[in-house]
Amino acid sequence: MLTVDQLEDKLIDLAFAEDIGDGDHTTLCCIPQDAMGKSQLLIKEDGILAGVEVAKKVFNRFDPTMQVHVLINDGTPVKVGDIAMIVTGKVRSLLQTERLMLNIMQRMSGIATQTNRYVRLLEGTHTRILDTRKTTPGLRMLEKQAVKIGGGTNHRIGLFDMILLKDNHVDFAGGIANAINRCHDYLKEKGLDLKIEIEVRNFDELQQVLDCGGVNRIMLDNFSVADTKKAVDIIAGRYETESSGGITFDTIRAYAEQGVDFISVGALTHSVKGLDMSFKACE
C-alpha cells in the first residue's frame, strides 16, 4: 500500500499533467526563461488555514529551486488581508504552479474552517467530530488531513483499516449475528487486528447487537435526539457510540449532549466551500 507521501506525489504529478499537458503556452510565449519574480498568498476570507505543507511540496516538486517563505502555518486562524506565504523563483514556475496550489489550499482551508465551526459547537462535551468516506476521489488523504487540521478526528481512511457493517452488509449477510460472526471468522483467518463498528437503524437491531456482542462501536443511524439519549442509556458505556445521518449545524450540539462519543458529518468534505485566497505578484 502506498504511503501518504507517495499518494501526494502521485496526485501532484497527475494534477500537473492534466493542467499543463504539453506546455503552458501562454506563459512560455510571453515570459523569458530566466525571468525571476516573487508572489504572495493573500487571504481574502476569515477561516482556518490548511494545506501549507502540501503547497510547499507542489512548488518544490515542480521546481526545486523555488524558495517558499511560510508566514502562517497550518491550523492557524486567518483573516482578510493576511499574507500566508511568499514564494520566490522563476516567473514561469510561479505561474505554472499557481492554480494547483490554490486549488489545494482553498479546498483544504475550506474543510478545516468548516470542521472547526462544528468542533467549536461541541466545546464542553466529550463528543468528537468524525469525517466520512464522502470525499473527492483522489483527494481523500488531503481532505482528511484538513479535517484534522480543523480539529476533527478521522474515521476510517478507507475500506481497508476498519470493519464497518452498514445496513446493506447486514441485510446481505442474513442478519446482525451472521454479519458479526463472519467478521470474526474472517479476521482470525487473515490474521488481521481491525476494530468492528456496526450500524443500527432501530432499537430492535440495537438489542440484537447487545445480545451478540463482539463489536467496538455502535453507530446510531438516523436516530432522533430523544432516541439517541435512550440508546446511549441502554448501551451504558459497554461500547463506543456514534451518531450519524441527517445531523446538521443546528442540531449537532443537542446530539452531543445526549452522551454519544462520536458524531460523523459528511458535510465536512462532500459539499464544502473553498476559502477565498489569491496568489499575486509582489515586490
List each model region and its residues.
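Acidic/glycine-rich phosphate/pyrophosphate-binding loops and surrounding catalytic core
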Residues: M1-C212, R217, A226-I234, Y239-E242, ...
